[in-house]
Amino acid sequence: MEHNHEFEGGHEHRHDHDHGPEHSKYEEALAKYNIRLCDEDVKAKTALLIEKHVAENNTPDVKKFLFHCIDLTTLKCTDSDESVMKFTGKVNEFVDKYPDLDNVAAICVYPNMAEVVNDTLEADHVNIACVSGGFPSSQTFTEVKVAETAMALHTGADEIDIVIPVGKFLSGDYEGMCDEIEELKAVCGEHHLKVILETGALGSASNIKKASILSMYSGADFIKTSTGTVSYTHL
């Protein structure tokens, strides 16, 4: 059964509900990797890596690099045109206050604030990132996610952050999850699509690895751990 939907801008939205052979391609992708992980082993290996490498990476150069990777974010219910303009102004002033440091990578805001940042941002080499797709829960219609993403890009966003549909993933609907990511990546085109796994809700290292593989398989340019709105797992 196939449904086609089209929204302003000509993007075609497709749902192909053939769960037999389609489902197998996702299982086939996962079968290429070891996804049966022991949580305690992962925890121990992670602790060992930190212990082994933290000292050598605790340097000014590494810290400068990490700072330059930051998406400076305001995602508050109290955000307004005025507050976001002021927030962006701090990024504009950064180069004068700290000439020896590279600026942040991006300013991240809700989609309706992309135009405000675009009109205010003067700093070089700082992108405009927008959360989209029913952030942070990802619980809305795919059509809404597509429209929201397209509007964010149209009004100035350089890159888009979405959250995987966690409910679909946990229920084994890999086709539904992957189709949605693929569709949003098609809207983004050459713009980066960053996919947030919401690891605190996934429950195990195996699930985190599966969600990572499926997200990248579906076109994610980056994967990220969490929105910060869900408690961490025990991992």
Task: Locate the predicted segments by residue.
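Alpha/beta catalytic barrel-like cores
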Residues: 17-106
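Short, acidic/polar
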Residues: 84, 143-151, 208-212
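Histidine-centered metal-binding segments
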Residues: 1-21
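Conserved small/polar residues in nucleotide/adenosyl-binding loops
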Residues: 233-234
